[in-house]
């Protein structure tokens, strides 16, 4: 088997394709969360604090002349939201998996032959 055919076989496996789709969706989701933080959360929740500090964005928060802790705070908020949403997605998937799994069948009772044998033995003992 040639190098390229092996690579093609590897690349077309379900797990690799699923992983690639997950990475692409994750990157797009990261952009959505970043926009949510910068365009919704920061203006709504942090607006009073930013106005008091005479700043327009959280990224402008600095300390000691150059430490940009505003960018760090933005990244932390971003991470917390992404982690929480992923937790909710995984929790929903696990809940759906539990519904899909059929309960184990009840233990099988005695077969017809075993019942007949028991009846025969009971009749013999009388």
UniProtKB/Swiss-Prot annotation:
It comes from the Bacteria. It is found in: Cell inner membrane. GO terms for cellular component: plasma membrane. The keyword Plastid does not apply. It is a multi-pass membrane protein. Keywords: Cell inner membrane, Cell membrane, Ion channel, Ion transport, Membrane, Transmembrane, Transmembrane helix, Transport. It holds the Pfam family MscL. GO terms for molecular function: mechanosensitive monoatomic ion channel activity. Gene3D superfamilies: Large-conductance mechanosensitive channel, MscL, domain 1. The keyword Transport applies. The chain crosses the membrane at residues 17-37, 70-90. InterPro entries: Mechanosensitive_channel_CS, MS_channel, MSC/AndL, MscL_channel. NCBIfam families: mscL. Homopentamer. Channel that opens in response to stretch forces in the membrane lipid bilayer. May participate in the regulation of osmotic pressure changes within the cell. Belongs to the MscL family. This is Large-conductance mechanosensitive channel.
């Amino acid at each position: 088997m040639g190098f390229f055919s092996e690579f093609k076989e590897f690349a077309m496996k379900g797990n690799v394709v699923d992983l690639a789709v997950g990475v692409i969706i994750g990157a797009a989701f990261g952009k959505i969360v970043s926009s949510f933080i910068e365009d919704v959360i920061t203006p709504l929740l942090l607006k009073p604090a930013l106005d008091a500090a005479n700043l327009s964005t959280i990224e402008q928060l600095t300390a000691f002349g150059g430490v940009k802790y505003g960018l760090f705070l933005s990244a932390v908020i971003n991470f917390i939201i992404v982690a929480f949403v992923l937790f909710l997605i995984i929790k929903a998937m696990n809940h759906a998996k539990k519904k899909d799994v059929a309960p184990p069948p009840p233990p099988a009772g005695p077969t017809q032959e075993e019942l007949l044998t028991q009846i025969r033995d009971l009749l013999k003992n009388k």
